[in-house]
């Protein structure tokens, strides 16, 4: 990481009734921080929130992270299934300017390689202003698989993770230029969008 790279502000939101009330320790935010710290070359400012499965509170938190905290990227974890209190996608779509359905489609494709119940996930991606918001699974292993994708024994991608598309999406909505460690995840951009290395 160097001072020539753009600062990235990332909101991490864990949505869980039990973790937010202290019944058990949240694992989502630490898993996200660990993965992002390994994957990103940019300096990162994290804004973290641990909240219950309450749609108005999720909406307010997402709005605050996008509009007040100035996050370029917001990642949520938890609350994406079909149960009555799984309302993270509903809150996410409610605050969106535009829905990006390809993110949810790819997340389900990745998870279907492991469990047939992946089709029950309602994960999605949206844009609010200049912020990309993505709903991720709640389990650390699933978070890593979703972001990074699935690789064969030689390290070649079998299924691309969603994060490969995140830097270019953020470019297109006016955010900072994100650089990744290719050994973790290789960001994809068209050649015309690749920034020349700084001297």
What are these regions (language model features)?
Residues 1-199:
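Non-catalytic beta/alpha edge segments that cap or flank active sites
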């Amino acid at each position: 990481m160097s001072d020539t790279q753009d600062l990235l502000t990332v909101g991490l939101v864990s949505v869980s009734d039990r973790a937010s009330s202290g019944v058990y320790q949240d694992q989502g935010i630490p898993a996200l921080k660990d993965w992002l710290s390994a994957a990103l070359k940019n300096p990162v400012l994290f804004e973290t929130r641990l909240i219950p499965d309450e749609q108005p509170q999720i909406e307010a938190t997402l709005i605050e992270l996008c509009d007040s905290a100035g996050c370029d990227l917001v990642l949520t974890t938890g609350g994406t299934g079909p149960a009555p209190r799984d309302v993270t996608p509903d809150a996410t779509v409610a605050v969106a300017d535009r829905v990006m359905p390809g993110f949810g489609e790819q997340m389900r494709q990745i998870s279907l390689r492991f469990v047939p119940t992946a089709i029950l996930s309602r994960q999605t991606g949206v844009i609010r202003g200049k912020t990309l918001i993505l709903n991720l699974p709640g389990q650390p292993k699933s978070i890593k698989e979703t972001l990074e994708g699935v690789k064969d024994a030689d390290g070649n991608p079998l299924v691309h993770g969603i994060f490969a598309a995140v830097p270019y999406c953020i470019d297109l909505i006016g955010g900072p230029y994100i650089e990744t460690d290719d050994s973790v995840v290789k960001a994809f951009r068209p050649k015309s969008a690749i920034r020349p290395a700084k001297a």
